[in-house]
Amino acid sequence: MTRNIAIIGGGIVGATAAYYLSRNGHQVTVFDEGTGQATSAAAGIICPWLSKRRNKKWYRLASEGAAFYKQLCKDVQEDGGDASFYTVSGAVLLKKTAKATQEQYEIGLKRREDAPEIGDLKILSKEELTTLLPSIQTQENALYVAGGARLDGDAMVREL
């Protein structure tokens, strides 16, 4: 049964909801003021797995959201669209001490059991870090997360 559905807000959440509802045959109208978009302001870093926030509900939401992008990209491509708005590029987490870097590494290993999209984790030497990011010359403690990604929210909204 086709329904007429109104969505308030055309950022990444509203656009994604509209995309999937339309994909399932519903008539969708998106209402959006177009100013003050969080989607446009966000850096688009997708790497929630190493957060030290104690809020388990937040972590679950963020982690499952990160995992969802793979399916969204697959669906967009199946529909003949361009999913280049999402790129798995890896992420580098900088820490002040080797101990803090090791702690983050251990958190990542544990969380990877339930979130394989984290990918490989590697504590970087200073030389590896400066090779990867030449503009960082004074940092010595870093953790590489292969599954870290970048989302261009504006491009995603336009594509959906």
Regions inferred by a protein language model and the residue ranges of each:
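Short beta-strand/turn micro-motifs composed of small residues
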Residues: 9, 32, 95
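Glycine-rich FAD pyrophosphate-binding loop
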Residues: 22-42
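Helical element adjacent to the flavin cofactor pocket in flavoenzyme catalytic cores
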Residues: 137, 142-160
